[in-house]
């Protein structure tokens, strides 16, 4: 409570009276500037998803959670567990930084982008989602935005959940948090998920050979955490989790060769930390280790056959973050150290390599009357490409009580991945991709409607593209992204409304052609209400047209995929104070659409679940 009260006083959040009505004083955000601050004091657009939201939406995957959020466009090669890409504000999927409890997701080190189709939604207790550049705070990848998945559970007790659904879907979950003495608490989560899936078809991606089979998914997850409070100011934690996933997919068929159409992923992560929370100073030291083994193989031969591939990576992280209350704001500073190592063959790199990065950052936030000022700078020293610096600044002006104008500018970058550097077609002389981004926004509270309208431009240079003639990767691409984002939320009696609209013009700046797999327009609407103890929810999504490549034709051609409107319906009912039953119909009107050309989506799906708490 000392920490919370100090922060609220330091930022003088009473000046933001309008936002205080929309955001509880208890709603604190960590991800925006790497220290706790009230959401009303954050100048960047931020969305928070809680475990209660996930349960109300009855989401069975992290992608299903993220697709509801402003600025997020997801392209997936089929159903649950199939490869997916996350585009935030039109940027590449490799331009999205995904954190797990503040630490980079290990799987992103091989491909350069995070595929959240494999991460268990059962571990997600909270998501903090920041849009816009954040490399000045986090380093590489944070061009389009940052998604921080937080696994720390806050509510004690035990919950048992079981669910069933279409395509033989099954899910069984146990989560418990217990107090061990006065100052120690332990958390344990176990989860099993299975679906037979459906035939994703993969037109054009199978070597002209149809593969009429079900492409299923199996996941087993285990999580444990121990937290201890040493005193009023000192606390520490140890936690670890792992998951074992198997995915069937449609693969490229070559006559006389094994058909590699099965993926087996083992992933484990461990971290430990020590925290100090003083009246004016906060400090945290975290050390983490993660190890992933990603096999692709023909099940008739097994994952140890010479035809199989293995991407294996180990990642070591040490983070020391600090913040000090200064005046009517805060100054933060910290150091990040990371080492990534791979085994031979990972990412088609014939030899094993390691890459080290040390980053030092400084942040500042001050509230001066009606003005809020924010700035950050960072320097990264990478073992491959040397030093790289980034910076950003923002200013907010409450020109009328309850109405604020925000302007920001930031630079960011994306480091080349190991395959681009050292693979068969790699180029060790690659430079990082660089971004410059501008944004202007108005936000306010009008007649009970909390709203924000933003306009932004993002120029990305030195993008890494594969040169067909030279058969190497080079820094020769450019992108120009312009967009408008509007969000609003309000209540009308028992009804709660959340609305967003995105217009994104993402183009190749050299050819002036649209970037693939991005919708030019998106509209999203969430309606929730309670009637006679029934908790109802309706989700609407409009995904505009997008472009992709048809590889079934030679030479391949660009195709335009039409837009689609999707509806989901959910309902939950508390049978007793301990037992709740839930039901969901996804894609209510059974729309046939694709987000990756040639790959089918699920169509209408049903799920039914029950949870018992004690």
From Swiss-Prot:
Subcellular location field: Cell outer membrane
Residues binding Ca(2+) 1: 199, 211, 213, 215, 250
Protein origin, superkingdom: Bacteria
Entry GO CC: cell outer membrane; pore complex
Gene Ontology BP, a term: monoatomic ion transport
List of residues binding cyanocob(III)alamin: 85, 92, 110-111, 251, 309, 517, 551
Motif TonB C-terminal box location, chain numbering: 597-614
PROSITE patterns linked to this entry: TONB_DEPENDENT_REC_1, TONB_DEPENDENT_REC_2, TONB_DEPENDENT_REC_3
Signal sequence, start to end: 1-20
Pfam families, sorted: Plug, TonB_dep_Rec_b-barrel
Keyword Kinase: no
Family the UniProt entry places it in: Belongs to the TonB-dependent receptor family. BtuB (TC 1.B.14.3.1) subfamily.
Entry protein name: Vitamin B12 transporter BtuB
Provenance organism: Salmonella typhi
Underlying gene: btuB
